[in-house]
């Protein structure tokens, strides 16, 4: 879909305060990013900024072009704030850049749409497989067009947990993972592949890493809290926050036994 077509659709039909086709430019953006990074994988760091890869710059260039053409304001991990518009897209062009550059097949494009301080839509595409998680506020969550729900696991001792960083201790899990792409790991909690995802204590995530995934998680029936077990605030496109994700029952159980 051309950028001009997307502009017209966003100015047209609405569901509440959300354009009917708000996910269309996000899909186009993710697909074009996937195509763009192929030739840059394995090139290493860009030298522009610490831990920034050549593939990050290539992906960001695509994101700014596609999203700017759709008249979004953009908040990107790679280039900061650009453009203007009623809707803001918070984007991590490639979440899991090291995985992508080194050939580990677990990395994603994360795109969250905000209207003011309200999170209204999100898309996370696994660029290694092409699988796509999507949600609009109040409309449920899907993976490749099929509705998703969390695992329903309620026992800490039977849970498969994933973390960003090293947990302070064994938290009673059955199995543990560290996969390296937060947005995608949150989505795997949303569809029941994982039971829990969290950051190590005293760590936080940037909003481009968690906003899209958290909307998908919530629309699927999961919850996200901070370390105190309080519901996570998703009203800011720039504030880093601690994140813990699971089903409501499992998070309550983890808090009660001191696992978080």
Explain the meaning of each model-derived region.
Residues 73-78, 91, 100, 178-180, ...:
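General beta-strand structural signal in soluble alpha/beta enzymes
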Residues 30, 148-260:
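An extended, acidic
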Residues 115, 143-144:
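Structural motif
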Residues 1-94:
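N-terminal subdomain of lithium-sensitive/metallo-dependent phosphomonoesterases centered on the IMPase/IPPase/PAP
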Residues 85-138:
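DPxDG-like acidic metal-binding loop motif
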Residues 42-46, 71-74, 141, 173-180, ...:
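Short secondary-structure junctions
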Residues 56, 96-97, 189, 217:
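Buried hydrophobic positions in well-ordered alpha/beta secondary-structure cores of metabolic enzymes
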Residues 79, 139, 146-147:
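Well-ordered beta-strand scaffold positions
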């Amino acid at each position: 879909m051309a950028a001009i077509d997307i502009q017209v659709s966003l100015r047209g039909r609405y569901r509440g305060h959300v354009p009917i086709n708000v996910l269309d430019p996000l899909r186009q953006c993710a697909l074009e990013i996937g195509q763009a990074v192929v030739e840059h994988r394995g090139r290493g760091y860009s030298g522009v900024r610490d831990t920034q890869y050549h593939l990050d710059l290539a992906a960001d260039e695509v994101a700014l072009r596609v999203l700017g053409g759709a008249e979004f304001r953009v908040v990107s991990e790679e280039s900061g704030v650009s453009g203007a518009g009623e809707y803001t897209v918070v984007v991590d062009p490639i979440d899991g850049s090291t995985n992508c550059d080194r050939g580990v097949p677990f990395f994603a494009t994360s795109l969250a749409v905000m209207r003011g301080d309200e999170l209204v839509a999100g898309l996370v595409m696994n660029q290694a497989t092409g699988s796509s998680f999507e949600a609009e506020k109040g409309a449920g969550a899907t993976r490749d067009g099929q509705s998703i729900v969390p695992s329903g696991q309620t026992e800490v001792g039977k849970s498969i947990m994933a973390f960003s960083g090293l947990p302070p201790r064994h938290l009673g899990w059955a199995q543990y993972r560290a996969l390296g792409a937060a947005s995608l790991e949150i989505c795997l909690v949303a569809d029941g592949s994982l039971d829990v995802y969290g950051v190590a204590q005293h760590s936080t995530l940037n909003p481009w890493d968690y906003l899209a995934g958290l909307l998908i998680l919530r629309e699927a029936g999961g919850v996200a809290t901070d370390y105190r077990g309080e519901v996570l605030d998703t009203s800011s496109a720039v504030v880093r926050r601690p994140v813990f994700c699971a089903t409501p029952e499992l998070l309550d159980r983890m808090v009660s036994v001191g696992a978080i």
